[in-house]
């Protein structure tokens, strides 16, 4: 009681349910999301939670807001929808809380690294626990993940090792200039 329950419904990405997931596991994830204060699906996971085709994804900001509102109405939790890419050359996330929505997009960096969703959720949760609003936590997490992707791409490391966020961690604890 008095805490914050964040559920990141890890079930798929890029329009596909993970091969290790069964339909029963997806049903159980829906049940888990129903007890959350905040859910953070990517567009594939949001489609699964809404009973839609996982390949479908919002094609505009208006559709993204509709999806977030539908998730809010179905699960009763605030929503952060990640992996929004309806605008050419951009990617980002949206948040929906208390009837208010915000979408934040930034320039896409043409690289893929596993674990960026986990990093996003962790940074966002840290910001929320530090007193930030959902909107500002979502924006800050998106900027941090974007910066770690850019930094990692510059290092030319094997993408299978994920993003190299450690050197950028001071940005999260030091005051912004």
Q: Predicted segment positions?
A:
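Membrane helix-loop-helix hairpins that form the core translocation module of multi-pass transporters
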Residues: 3-13
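Charged C-terminal helix
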Residues: 135-177
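Conserved phosphate/ATP/ADP-binding segment of small-molecule kinases
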Residues: 19-102
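Short, small-residue alpha-helix embedded
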Residues: 48, 111-134
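A short helix->loop->beta-strand "cap" motif at the edges of active sites that frequently abuts
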Residues: 1-5, 74-77
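Short pre-catalytic strand/loop immediately N-terminal to key active-site residues, enriched for Gly-Thr
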Residues: 101-114
């Amino acid at each position: 009681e008095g805490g914050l329950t964040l559920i990141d419904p890890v079930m798929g990405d890029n329009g596909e349910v993970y091969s290790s997931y069964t339909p029963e596991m997806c049903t159980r994830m829906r049940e888990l999301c129903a007890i959350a204060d905040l859910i953070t699906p990517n567009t594939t996971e949001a489609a699964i939670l809404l009973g839609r085709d996982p390949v479908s994804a919002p094609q505009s900001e208006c559709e993204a807001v509709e999806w977030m509102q539908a998730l809010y109405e179905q699960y009763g939790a605030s929503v952060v929808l990640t992996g929004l890419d309806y605008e050419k050359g951009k990617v980002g996330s949206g948040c929906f809380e208390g009837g208010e929505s915000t979408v934040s997009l930034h320039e896409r960096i043409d690289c893929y690294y596993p674990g960026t969703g986990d990093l996003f959720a962790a940074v966002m949760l840290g910001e929320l626990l530090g007193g930030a609003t959902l909107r500002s936590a979502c924006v800050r997490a998106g900027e941090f993940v974007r910066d770690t992707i850019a930094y990692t791409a510059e290092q030319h490391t094997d993408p299978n090792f994920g993003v190299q966020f450690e050197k950028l961690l001071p940005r999260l604890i030091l005051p912004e200039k």
